[in-house]
């Protein structure tokens, strides 16, 4: 297998070249409010951590999560179907195993456990359910790869994506009392148009910031070359009205579409901050954030086929998905010249996240039934409320040949998860006339949660000439949850919810340590060890589904998932550029997976005892439960570097770069057998060549992205079929993409940016898209046997982005 390592060999060659062209870097900035930086003379590079600042976000024309990680091969976006994404994939884990925080506040649980997706996601309910955030609101994004619960708490098993929102101080100061920024543009891949305004002002001790953004667009386009293919179930569909005449040769409703379902969507986002400085050392601030996305989808790819219980049907299904987030918060900052802290920040936030799905089915035979036609409506709602407080302290002590910078603090919070399911039928031509009663139920066990934490993180600069740096930290977390008791629960159901009304807690310590040795003027040896954990989500713990065809048992006895991460690297920086080469290994254990327990029993002492809500005990029904099962390991190599080519006599402003990630791993089953991990992305290398004019007026960048195929032998079919590959992996092929972007500054106020993606109009499948296909349910489907409709999952062809921004 020599080919996958070619980018790594190139990376090693570039690493050897950098020291020869290095020169003295500029001194680091000193400490600022709420940020302690150990003062030194060399540029600090951290293993497994990348910061993307506002300037880079603008340069890369970032409009969503896919744009954010487009040129970072070590992270990808988990596809979620029509309604968006399900978080990120980092180092072989995804979804809730990668933490997402905004200003330190955790975002919604993804509701993406296997059991939840089996029951709801497969039929189009919350198939994309991790809320996204507006890119125009952020001043900086920090991506951490590898276990990172020391900084990010529960969920940072494989890494974390931490967003930091803009502040008035990013734009105004004593010398500049106001700022106005206006930005607009278009995104070709989904016919998106957007506009955003950023306004900031400062008067006396008061400052304010407002960011308002509106986006609207359509479905994300693909690169399809085939037409829609009618689907048949083996060419026939069983007709229950004629049980003795074998199969009837009529066609099942629905088609294997080669194009995305028609969709229209709109997003509105508001960020408002208000602050007052009592003096140079005391400040109070208030924040308000509000964001809503509505998606209207004509679900033409929804597959309703005949079964042994019913003939083929084919209603037109329409959906509206709503994602809503509202946050308010207050914070207080203090600085002391002498005392137990140099800086203190107290913060309290309240957050509400709603994820809704509204479905309505219009019958295909409405033209023959006329006024008697009926429409089925279904509304599913999930709400997650969070309240969090934190107290963060920072202190730096300077000694003759050492500096000690400490960060310490504590915090806590509580959460509440509620849900609702409502369904009814109405007249097609007069929706005000119901034809059935309103069925309103709680579809999931509701729960409450609490958490608290305390941490102590230290950075030591040792020896003269800033040669040694040591980081060491510890954090304690305790997370607990309890299922809400409901008097409507039948006694049979109560018996199937152990510890109903009582708390189930997970507590433990997280650690992190790192070492930075500058062994030459421009080279550093880096080392890092860190741990991570993920407490079970609410649906993993409490989800109960008593049904004669599929019986799911709750499991409050789940243990937290855990990870250990080791990393070693070499870094260099200077006028010629910078680079970082690292190798890592991460071990995971106690993965939570949906487990088949066997057929149900009517023995109350049997763990497979499965009563229905009426008390009837099922016999022989498949029983499933979320359980801690597997362990896993991943290891790999990453390289990223930038080379300023004027260091070898080429024109000033010319630069090139390389970003490579290669990772492999295996899951270890309970029987000791090692199996592939589907969440591992194939190796990817991103090459870049760019020019920024010395006048800063214009620049151009070209990118070439090479991604290997995901081999079927590196996949598994499912947790219950570990001996066969994922059937759609055979469509994964290696591909190379070429992109081009440019900018032009017109005076000091106006900037034009444009980009062309997939210039060669390549047809390709990402691995994330292929592994999102379902073999059951009604959405994200293709024909299981012929794979007709697979081209619906191709990525966009050639597309163009454009933005214009004015700042005053």
Per-region residue spans from a language model:
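Transmembrane beta-barrel wall of Gram-negative outer-membrane proteins
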Residues: 188-217, 222, 226-298, 324-327, ...
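Acidic, small-polar-rich N-terminal luminal/periplasmic segments of exported/outer-membrane proteins
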Residues: 24-171, 568
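Gram-negative outer-membrane beta-barrel transporters
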Residues: 394, 461-466, 470, 478-479, ...
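Outer-membrane beta-barrel signature, preferentially recognizing the C-terminal barrel domain
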Residues: 310-339, 447, 499-510, 514, ...
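Face-selective signature of the C-terminal outer-membrane beta-barrel domain
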Residues: 277-291, 323-493, 508-518, 580, ...
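C-terminal beta-signal and adjacent terminal beta-strands/loops
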Residues: 110, 533, 587-590, 594-596, ...
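Short strand-turn segments of transmembrane beta-barrel domains in outer membranes
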Residues: 140, 148, 160, 165-201, ...
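Short loop/turn motifs that connect adjacent beta-strands in outer-membrane beta-barrel proteins
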Residues: 152-153, 168-178, 205, 281, ...
